[in-house]
């Protein structure tokens, strides 16, 4: 007997897929398997839990049981999938197996932990479960070091600072948000973080961590060191591809899919942070929403093709929020930047003066949707 459509994962991508399927078909069998509790929470809230004084349980929006009842699902929480037998269409755990008609991998991404001595001392905040394991240490910590000055690193740095902690950010880039935008566009946020008291150690290389009587001693290049109470790894995410690899699927940075979200095995699909679409991994909410809508149609034998319009990426740093869109890291762009008290507008134009990317901050974020319409992709 088949378990119908089987989904591995229970995060935002999996839940959006379930909701879209159930809008179109209330009876087709849906089976979800995940290693976590399968309770729903809003993952972006993890960037603000410390300043809000929240505990992990405070984030729960809906229990797994309520989710199963509302959407007519079979759920298998706290279940580690050990193997996918693609030839026989079987998903296996240590104690169970499920036969699928179609399989969806919504396995997400895992935090990158820099491979340095003492790496086991680093905390991660990529899930409600991870925060639950780290919350006591983080709330008690007076001195926090964040490894990584990207999107999540900047959000966490501001949040910890707003909670009254002494915050240091270490990154080997010359500016914050280096993977998202040029320094001309990120300098305003960088200045604001410094104003708030965040110690930015840029162009710095992490070399190791060691537990001492006074805390965690963090060694950096050029014989520098700092002692803190907690170290948080925010150095990026790696798509979780191990199951897909074992199943013989094509892997590049993520699980390679076509415009139908179909992998190299026509019965297996991938969605969310683990999927690589047109050579790109898009770990943001809007592409996941659009991908879930498209995939629901394909799983129900309706033709759906994913077309991604220009989309906003939001940097949730409350004291200086930012929106960006387009190919902000293109080397051939000229940046026209207007900075005023109420915010920044940075436009990246190509040699033909066509708008290819932009960054807006604070009150200028209201111009984002008009700029989106002008973007040339």
From Swiss-Prot:
Primary location recorded for the protein, binned into one broad class: cytoplasm
Keywords: Cytoplasm, FAD, Flavoprotein, NAD, Oxidoreductase
Reaction(s) catalysed by this chain's protein: 2 reduced [nitric oxide reductase rubredoxin domain] + NAD(+) + H(+) = 2 oxidized [nitric oxide reductase rubredoxin domain] + NADH
Gene3D superfamilies xrefs: 3.30.390.120, FAD/NAD(P)-binding domain
Assigned EC number: 1.18.1.-
GO cellular component, one term: cytoplasm
HAMAP family cross-referenced by the UniProt entry: NorW (MF_01313)
Protein name (database record): Nitric oxide reductase FlRd-NAD(+) reductase
Organism: Klebsiella pneumoniae (strain 342)
Gene for this chain: norW
